[in-house]
Design a protein with these regions (language model features):
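N-terminal secretory signal peptides and thylakoid transit peptides that target proteins
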Residues: 1-11
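Terminal low-complexity, poorly structured segments
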Residues: 9-11, 15, 628, 637
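Hydrophobic membrane-targeting alpha-helices
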Residues: 14, 18-22
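N-terminal pro-sequences and low-complexity stem/linker regions of secreted or lumenal proteins
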Residues: 24-667
Length: 667
């Protein structure tokens, strides 16, 4: 009874609070236009306030008429503030849509950090410089495109956001959590090593348009979302699953309470998902002889349960759902928790929706040495559909799972179906053979990943992949009917000042949903040019957009998911356990990114050429010669402010240890 009483005590707190305390939520338009840009961009800008006033339903009908393809370019592990914290016009570290922030206005801006001598100091956000000067006067390059990964476990992230007694995130424990230190009466529990202190500094860092000019170019030309949150407080796998399910398994937890987890990596066989286990399908536990799914060469974190709650791949089956699920190899194992969902989807009268999940290394890639797939770049715990038996254990459903090379081949050959939803992911290494700028030969094989995950991916290699994907779409007939959504699974545990709104808690009473802020952009011929959307959004908003465009029943309205939610209300005092594509306040959709005049045909759509980045620029590292802000004509909001880089800062404390300014450090 004690655990349930805890959940009742905290479950209703925080909702409706903390969402926009820096942003002034509810006091500004959904979309504003960023400060003046180049002539190329300015010529395509219309003040959002001058758009025709139409109802949400009228706008949705226009979107349905124009958009037939939704592409989700799904990257890894960056906070919004890390990439866009100094983007003009957004709710950033130094300024918001209305101008600079006053001291103390940004949550967690100044954080405690313990020095290696045990004294207490502070750290504030800073931009990672391209170079520093060491004690001998030598210029030392830091290569900010290659940084270590900080702690993004469920427990660590819950500590970092630091809820107060009212359930409002203070975002004040990022540095101390990285150090592994707590303060008791102002005194540290232990003295951190140099490496741990450097991680405490790294978590507060950010970059700008000099490091990721392609990302800023897309934000400049199309629509950036400055309040898009991840769904689960925690790592990649639960948030990959949330991208297609709107939850991490809470309804499965409610239907099977003995499956609850208290968190911690290695405890994979539990729901809701809170760690990064490998999918059950393809693991050593999967003894089925049919449809053996691939596993990554590098595995950790145990093995997941078979996930049995509803997701978009189930909804995508549409009116053919009974015929499709009849092909499942083990329906008693895969389908018991969605029987009523299947009936409702079957009776909805909507045809099956085409879809595809394209992920590097899932099958043979173009850089594999022979006809056999090596799966060398495959990160299995990023492949959300592989966790669901009704996909991975069904010969019809698995035809929707592909490798990354397949995406480029299918788009170039015009082999996509007449409409649909398509997810695209990178992984370890990259199929183009791009090398990070850092000349260290060891790091060339450590940071050559293309999915943007710190610790193994290079930021510019990763934005190069995005550019190749967008170019492929823009060069195809699909461009004129497309909505391209770039977003991330989670924040990697990097500092972000926007307060997540906590609506649910796990079995241990730790915050479960929603998590920290992450980048999100919409690119489309019908997008608001140079816009910043301030609509509260998250992974479920992408699902909601897909629901709306393809007239699907929201996952939250399916009967088995409703049953799980009702158990959460009745037995655990929590109202919002389950999908958030409906019935959860404060979760908007992605429609604010679309220009009404363009949708109505009264203003020219944005051209494919406007979206394309030339191949020669993609292949030239560093992008824009490391001078992206000047090339783009953008002045970051920290321009002219002191950049308080800690004297012992190191962007890669684990792979290139030491102090760059001390002399003798190898990047």
């Amino acid at each position: 009874m004690g655990r349930r009483m805890l959940l009742i005590a905290v479950g209703g707190l925080g909702l409706g609070r903390g969402l926009g305390q820096e942003m002034g939520a509810g006091t500004k338009p959904d979309v504003t236009i960023a400060p003046k840009s180049t002539a190329v961009v300015s010529a395509r800008v219309i003040d959002a306030a001058n758009e025709p006033a139409i109802s949400a339903q009228e706008k949705l009908q226009l979107i349905r008429r124009r958009i037939k393809y939704v592409f989700v370019l799904f990257q890894e592990n960056r906070s919004f503030d890390f990439y866009f914290g100094s983007y003009p016009g957004a709710d950033g570290l130094y300024a918001g849509p209305s101008g600079p922030y006053a001291s103390g206005q940004v949550a967690g801006f100044t954080q405690a950090i313990v020095n290696t001598d045990g004294t207490l100091g502070t750290v504030t956000p800073f931009r990672i410089p391209a170079t520093v000067t060491d004690t001998a006067g030598k210029t030392v390059p830091l290569y900010p495109a290659d940084i270590a990964s900080v702690n993004h476990s469920h427990v660590a992230t819950a500590r970092k956001i630091a809820l107060d007694a009212d359930g409002v995130a203070q975002n004040s424990e990022y540095a101390l959590t990285e150090e592994g230190v707590t303060l008791v009466d102002g005194k540290p529990s232990k003295v951190p090593t140099l490496e741990r202190k450097q991680f405490g500094e790294l978590v507060m860092s950010h970059v700008d348009c000099d490091t990721v000019p392609f990302l800023w170019r897309y934000a400049d030309r199309f629509t950036l979302f400055d309040h898009f949150m991840d769904t689960i407080v925690g790592p990649s796998t639960p948030n990959a699953i949330a991208m297609i399910a709107g939850q991490g398994g809470e309804t499965q937890w409610m239907l099977h309470p003995d499956a609850a987890t208290t968190g911690g990596i290695g405890m994979g066989a539990t729901v809701p998902m809170l760690s990064d286990p490998q999918p059950y399908w393809g693991s050593a536990l999967d003894t089925a002889q049919q449809l053996k799914q691939p596993q990554a060469l590098h595995t950790f974190g145990g093995v997941s349960k078979n996930l049995t709650f509803a997701s978009l791949p189930l909804s995508f089956m549409g009116s053919t759902i009974k015929k499709t699920t009849a092909r499942d190899y083990d329906p008693a194992f895969d389908l018991p928790d969605v029987q009523e969902d299947i009936e409702k989807i079957a009776g909805h009268g909507v045809s099956a929706v085409n879809w595809g999940w394209y992920q590097q290394g899932y099958d043979r890639e173009k850089n594999d040495p022979d006809a056999k797939a090596t799966h060398d770049g495959y990160v299995a715990h990023h492949n959300a559909p592989q966790y669901f038996g009704y996909v991975a254990n069904n010969p019809v459903a698995t035809t929707h799972l592909h490798g990354l090379s397949d995406f480029f081949r299918d788009v170039a050959a015009k082999q996509l179906p007449a409409s649909g939803v398509f997810y695209v992911r990178g992984g370890y290494g990259n199929i183009e053979g791009w090398k990070p700028q850092d000349p260290n030969p060891r790091l060339a094989t450590v940071f050559n990943g293309n999915d943007d995950h710190p610790g193994y991916s290079d930021s510019q290699v990763s934005e190069a992949l995005l550019a190749e994907e967008i170019n492929a779409i823009a060069s195809s007939p699909y461009w004129s009917q497309s909505a391209i959504i770039i977003t991330y699974d989670e924040s990697d545990g990097e500092y972000d000042h926007a307060r997540p709104r906590i609506r649910s808690y796990d079995a241990a009473g730790l915050p479960l949903e929603q998590g920290p802020r992450i980048p999100a952009l919409v690119i489309s011929p019908y997008a608001v040019a140079h816009g910043v959307s301030h609509v509260p959004t998250e992974h479920s908003s992408v699902i909601r957009f897909v629901d709306e465009v393809f007239t699907l029943i929201p996952l939250a309205d399916l009967p088995d998911e409703e049953r799980g939610r009702e158990i959460g209300k009745k037995d655990f005092g929590q109202d919002y356990l389950g999908p958030a594509d409906d019935k959860v306040p404060g979760v908007g959709d992605m429609s604010s990114a679309f220009d009404v005049l363009r949708l109505q045909g009264k203003r020219a759509p944005l051209s494919a050429a406007y979206a394309i980045i030339p191949k020669r620029e993609i292949d030239a590292f560093p992008h824009d010669h490391g001078d992206g802000c000047r090339v783009l004509g953008i002045t970051p909001t920290d321009s002219g402010l002191p950049n308080p880089v800690p004297s012992d800062f190191n962007p890669r404390p684990d792979s290139t240890p030491g102090i760059p300014t001390a002399g003798g450090w190898t990047p």
